[in-house]
Amino acid sequence: MNDLAKMIPWETDYIEDSKGAPWTELVDEDYHVKVFRDMYPVTEGHLLFVPKYNTIAVMNDAVASAIRHGERKLLDQEWDGFNLGMNVGEAAGQTCTWPHVHLIPRRNGDMPDPTGGVRHVIPEKGNYRK
């Protein structure tokens, strides 16, 4: 996946056909973004926010939509926190070229020490306080 178009998905033509994409059930959508359940959830409720159009502005809408969704879950006390992220490039773990944002619910006790959050993508760098 050294092709720049594969590493930076919002620079490619938007892929209408999502066959082979890492999402399953459509759970919500608005004018700019579709929300799917992740096929390989990290935690219960792991969602993918997929822009409908190939523009960086709509990618920003996907990020904003994910944050708003997470905030609602916090206010409703369904989640205790959340992680938000993207994998861009093979070195970052990107396995498909569809642009999407991961919203991963977190609950107290779902791991012994969550300090560092997303920094755990490289386990020995995760807890920067040790």
PLM segments and residue spans:
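HIT superfamily nucleotide-processing domains
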Residues: 1-130
